[in-house]
Amino acid sequence: MKRDKHCFDVTEEGLEMDGAFVAPFYPVLREKRLIHTQSPQKVRKEYHIYVKLADGSELGTHTFTSINNIRYSEYWDECCDAELTSTARKGLQIFLQHIVMQQEYVVCYEVERLGLCMVEPVIFIYGYRKAIVPDGINILFSSQVPIVSDEGKQGNIQELLYYAKRLITLRPGITDILFYVRILGVLRPLLEETGCPADFFVGLFGASGTQKSTYAKLFFAEDSAQFLSFSSYNGKQILKRVEQYSGHIVVVDDYHPLAKKYDREKQQSALDAIARNADSGQGALVVITGEFMEGCFSLQDRMIQISVPKSTTDGYVLSKELQQLQCQKDMLGSLVYEFAQKVYGNFDKMKEQTQKLFLQQENNIYTFRIERNIKFLVVAIRLFEICFPEISAWGIEKQLETSLKSVLENQKKHMDIVRRLEYDKDWTREVFLMLSSPGFKRKYEFSKTASDMNEIIVEGDRIYITEMVLEREMGRFLECRVKSSDISEHLSKTQVLEEDQSLARTKKKNGIRYYVISRSRLKLYYLSTVSRDK
């Protein structure tokens, strides 16, 4: 081997240069890499080198970012280059440079997270063993990439689609929407590149026992690291997980601010962080669960709110079906990966198709963001139909249309209430509407037992209601969290609340403290607001 004036040879004793002995070992280049990093976008070089001894035995491979002045004894104990002369060390350096020049670089792309890591070339990472990359592209995983359960259940596409149909038709109005929220999670990186970022998050709300967490685990939490809770994680920890799981969904379970000030503020702060981060349209799509919707108008407007009422069907049958679907949920992961392959394997075509679908939507001026956000679910449905035209035979178009309309109308109604409460705060009017609503339960006499504190009692012109019941019933009526202190303050200002000389807002009767509301004054106040609005 010749390069310039040097000639190298490997003998039984080791490496020779120009006929002179250099060392009883010599380096061998296994591979040299040119690595494109994702963040920051830079290029670095790596050299994978091992050592051969004179007897032909090989020592382990080590990675170097530079081949200059390698101290072999630091990496391979069998090498004694410290005892070599400067001429011999120089000979090893020249030999290494020579063999490096003889080999071509292997171009690699290093990824640091899941989701769409690079657009040119298109690299979409679903999990460690499931990556969508063009042929001939080499990828490396950095230590930052989270490990996800991406084995999935291998089966033909018809089996996977049948499982999806079972999910969608399980509980129309809930499970069909949740399925397409999962699809939307995969599409989020594409939407960002399309210029239509999905800048919102999803809220799953319902009373205790409505199986919100069960639905969330079934549809969204492919890996345990994707299922967080408001009580155990703060906003910073949640956002870090959101950044890691791009192209997936992160669930934050059980929004339920506790009585303790610290817990309450921690959960509220985490919810606020999720809402602010949603504006970027980057990272994982966040799904939260909770018993009620809370927060200012701006925060709630950034949500797609899905209500989960108690099932009218046999609870045992529904739970059994959910359990069966949960045991097979790896089929959903496999189907979603098949969908991701079709989308990110034909990136330019799907990007163009997505833009067309958004242009086909009506661009009306909207009052609430849900009127715009619901269009993202429509696009998700259409793209899924394009990728899997077989589902047109299911005959669920009307069901999906009804479900989307229900989500839209329910949230518009709720947001109208939130806006009215935030900006008008006419609690006295709301109390009248609550007490006058159809089916509202009340008693017309005291039982003089402890059960009275859980009831609304009407006695003549007076309405007796405890602080706890006022908060509970108004919260149910408005479908949001309220404070009795805000309501009682407004009732006092409008002179609807009966007060004595002590100015205490509650009065004791039969050992229980009640707010005492005058029915006649309450009705007069409401009628005055109606005439004022006209």
Descriptions of predicted regions:
Residues 1-173, 240-248, 264, 299-301, ...:
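Conserved glycine-centered beta->alpha loop in an early N-terminal alpha/beta scaffold
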Residues 118-158, 163-167, 350-534:
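DNA transaction DNA-binding modules
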Residues 136-225:
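P-loop NTPase catalytic core of nucleic-acid-dependent motor ATPases
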Residues 203-205, 214-264:
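AAA+/P-loop NTPase substrate/partner-engagement loops
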Residues 246-249, 281-286:
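Loop/turn-to-beta-strand initiation segments
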Residues 267-280:
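Conserved catalytic/switch belt of AAA+ P-loop NTPases
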Residues 283-291, 304-307:
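Structural recognition of the conserved hydrophobic beta-strand(s) that form the central parallel beta-sheet
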Residues 297-391, 397:
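Phosphate-sensing "switch" segment of ASCE/P-loop ATPases
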